[in-house]
């Protein structure tokens, strides 16, 4: 990418003010979309799901950890059962996202719990989490229907193929890598009212782009993102380390 043009301060200020107007317009549009997201209707979750964490088996309601709101990031796992024979580790793109998650205290203060969920044995998850040094609670949905019902694991013997609200025919045209026997990533949101749990929102693909903290910083600089999200390696594999 070429460097920006060098101009006089007056020309820079005029260009910056023009951009500011566009930024404010985009902010107002995003505010409206965010409000519409919050106003989405919700559906009650009636199926019993079992997860495994460090302390043993837990339910979906347990994942809230006493709070009213729950965000689950569907962390894709790379192993033979998801189309990656010979591997047993987390997805590097999902790892890039989780690298940007900091302390969770502010979320907790807003009655919101954030967890990671993967369709992998808990022993594999714990080994990879230790390697990466993350503190975000992480649960296994292995042998559970949760991933399938959230449309991030695919088995046409269980459910018709669907990802990002597209059916099999649309996926064959736009995302042929989504097929039976594979996994993908996404995020789902739940609300708890007493003992009742409701699903309010799920996003997939570019829908979780806004959660990529590194990109939010890179979008401020002239060189921009520089790499596609799939081109970022595990952070401990940079050679030499940045």
Regions found by a protein language model. Give the residues of each.
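Catalytic nucleophile loop
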Residues: 108-125
